[in-house]
Amino acid sequence: MINRMLVTPTAALSSLFALCALFSISADADDREKLLGNWKLVSVYAEDVQTKQRHNPYGDHPKGYIAFTSAARFFALITADGPKPPTVQEEQAAAFRSMSAYTGKFRLEGDKFITKVDVAWNQAWVDTEQTRFWRFEGDRLHIISAPVANPNVAGSLLVGYLVWERE
């Protein structure tokens, strides 16, 4: 007597969904491992969503680092490469505007990492979620921001493009 297993369409679909979820969890874990560590800024530019005009918000020689930790914490610091330390109030204000620094717990969702900001150079970012899209090209990590309001042009949106190399 031969025992045959009957597989209903519902059972087959449930198994397929479970298998897909397992591969998704495995892929997220692999991606998480690839992201972990310290990354040094190679390049950054911002592009206007409508006009496609590009500019360097941190100047021609920005400096920066990001870090993804195994405790799911993300750190970021980017500064413009200024000619000298600021000495007067106007220079200090300009220095503040030419940097970005924040940290928080991050999670991966496919090609996005989302950081729940708990400390930032700009208090307006605290308790927000910062969404970034990411991909690897060779040994380099490419991060693209979601569109954000252009602080210099009312009604305009910018997207940031950043390239990092492992430290």
Predicted segments with their positions:
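Bacterial N-terminal signal peptides that target proteins for export
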Residues: 1-15
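Lipid interaction determinants
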Residues: 10, 22-167
